[in-house]
Amino acid sequence: MNKNLSLKLAPRSKIDGVIKPPGSKSITNRLLLLSSLCNQSISLTNHLISDDSKYMIKALEDLGVSISSDTKDKITIFGDPKKFNNSADLFLGNAGTAYRPLCALLSILGGNYRLDGVERMHERPIKDLVDSLSSIGADIKYLKNIGFPPVQVSDFKFNGKTDISIKGNISSQFLTSLLMAVPLIGQDFKLNIDGELISKPYIDITIKLLKLFNVNYINHNYSSFEFNCNDNPKLYSLDSGLIDIEPDASSASYFFAAAAISGNIRVEGLSKESIQGDIQFLEVLEKMGADITYNNDSIDVRKANTLVGGQFDCIAIPDAAMTLAAMGLFTSSPLELFNINSWKVKETDRIVAMENELRKFGATVTSTENSLKIIPPANISDNVSVHTYDDHRIAMCFSLACLANKSVEIQDPECVNKTYPNYFNDFLKLLS
C-alpha cells in the first residue's frame, strides 16, 4: 500500500443509482471464527473480501484450519478446534475483529501463540479482556506495554471458576470475544457485564450467530449471560452448511447519507430486519428530513428538502456515526453527536481526527471525551485535502464533501481496503 497516493474527487452535485455493498465485516469475521470451531464444512457466500477478513483467514490457516475459495463470492471453512496447531505466530494488522476474539479463543484452547499487529494495534487497549481471561486460568503475557498488544498466549489451566466479568463501556469487542470463546470450556458458565454496555447492536449480532451455531445461553437483559454447555452435543455446529452474509450496513451508510444530502439511492440486500445495528442510521436520516422506503430486500433513500441537524445518541451506531458527523457540513442547523467515547480506541482517535478534518471544511467544531458538536459552515471550503489517519471510515465519510460541488482530495485512499476495497469505484459510478 502506497500511503503517498491521493485521490482527487471532482465537484459533484448529485448521486443516483443502485448499489449492493460488500458483505458485513462484523458478520464475516464472526462467522469465519465460529465456522473454524465446527467439526464440519461450512460455506459462506457474499463474505467480505478486505484487509480485516484476510487477516482473519490467514490467522485461521496458520492455526491449521483449511479454507478454500470456491468462487469469488463463496468460501468454505473446514474447521475443528481439536486439530488446531499447538503454536503459531499470528500477525493481525489493525483488525480488532480478528485480534480480540482470537486472543480469547486461543487463551482458552491453550498452546503457544504470539499475536501481533501494526503500530496502531499496539495502542488499542486489551487489558480488560486479558484480565477477564486470566481470572479463569488463561496465561497471557504482554510483550511490550502492559495492557496492549502484542501478547503471548500459553497453556490454559482452568481454575474451576464458573463466572467471569468484563467492563461494558470500553469496547463491545471484549464481550463479543468472550461470548464466542467461553463455551469452549465445555461447562455451564456465567458472563457478567460491569457498567453500561456500549455498542449493544454488535453484541446482538454475536448472540444471534451463536444461536445459529447451537450455543445455548440465557440473556439477562445484557447484564449477564448464562451458558448451558453441559451435555450439548450440537455445540458449535450448524444445521445448514451454507450461510449468506448480508451487505455491510456501515458501508451502506455512505450511500444512504449521500442520497439524503443530494440524490436518490437504492441499496440492495438490506432490509429493516437487518441484524446489524447501523441499520438504525436510517432512523436518524428520517429525523433529519430524508425520505426512506423499506422494501423486502432493498432500501431507498431520497434527498431531504432541508437537511436539519439536531442532537443524536450514537451509542448504537458508533461506525455510522462517523458518516453522520460528515453530514454536519451540510445541515441547516448544528449537529451534535454524543455517546461516541468508543471512537477513541478505534483505528485512530476518531474524535480528534474528525474535529481536525471538519474544521478544514470551515465547520466550527467542539468536542468532549464523549461528544462532538458541529456548526456547519456558511460555505464549505473548496480543494480541501483530507488526512485519513490510516482510518478507512474517515476516507469514506469525507468523500461526501464533494457533493457540495467542491473538489476534495483524499490522502491514502487505499486505507479503505480494510473494509471496502472498491468503495471509491462504486461511489464515483453513482455521481453526476
Residue ranges and their predicted role:
Residues 1-432:
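Structural preference for solvent-exposed beta-strand-turn elements
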